[in-house]
Amino acid sequence: MSRFGVFIIGVLFFMSVCDVLRTVSAEEHSHDENHVHEKDDFEAEFGDETDSQSFSQGTEEDHIEVREQSSFVKPTAVHHAKDLPTLRIFYCVSCGYKQAFDQFTTFAKEKYPNMPIEGANFAPVLWKAYVAQALSFVKMAVLVLVLGGINPFERFGLGYPQILQHAHGNKMSSCMLVFMLGNLVEQSLISTGAFEVYLGNEQIWSKIESGRVPSPQEFMQLIDAQLAVLGKAPVNTESFGEFQQTV
């Protein structure tokens, strides 16, 4: 095999190993820091404001934009609130919802600095996680067979399948196809689309049930309402903020 072929095998093997480790980490440890989608994809999911309203410019490509300070009044931080329940958010890492979690965490901390907040990956059902991991190893094995020109079927007296002959004759295109299709199937298996919010032991929002992520104002109103139910709402606190009309 030429040096170029060895180099390509090494690159694809390394990419496959990274993909396997990423999937295992997301399902076993329930904490990931990958898969941040582009800003436009996030705005299509979370941007529920009209086009006529002004927004600030993001400092990073994956930044979730919020209203300008001149048209949005943030609430006063409630520093004296004690013994607050833990806010837990379980989100789909592979869907790119990590940035949504970070943004909503900021909103909650601005009003309730003493509120403990936790976030974790919302894992798919167990059988889907196992199938996705198995597909990662199968994909890696197929890439090695194709790039190495190996025919394992001969050892079992099964000859030389036509599809394998075609793959050996078109190694680069075949490997690209296997890699992309494998990733597509894996992502479809581990993607849950979840953004589930719990305050204490009570669930206050479910994207799986509602089909959408709450707006920042809804998010804070849900927290305020649940704190009131628990008898932990501070007295005379303002809501998340008010949108002011600009002339």
UniProtKB/Swiss-Prot annotation:
From which domain of life does this come?
A: Eukaryota
Instruction: Name the enzyme's class.
Output: oxidoreductase
State the name under which the record lists this protein: Thioredoxin reductase-like selenoprotein T homolog selt-1.1
Q: Which Gene3D superfamilies match?
A: Glutaredoxin (3.40.30.10)
Q: Which organism is it from?
A: Caenorhabditis elegans
Q: What is the lineage of its organism?
A: Eukaryota, Metazoa, Ecdysozoa, Nematoda, Chromadorea
Q: Which cysteines are joined by disulfide bonds?
A: C92-C95
SUPFAM superfamilies from the xrefs?
Thioredoxin-like (SSF52833)
Tissues of expression? Broadly expressed in neurons of nervous system including ADL, ASH, ASI, ASJ, ASK and AWB amphid sensilla neurons, in epithelial cells including hypodermal, arcade, pharyngeal, vulval and rectal cells, and in somatic muscle cells of the head, neck and body wall, and non-striated pharyngeal muscles.
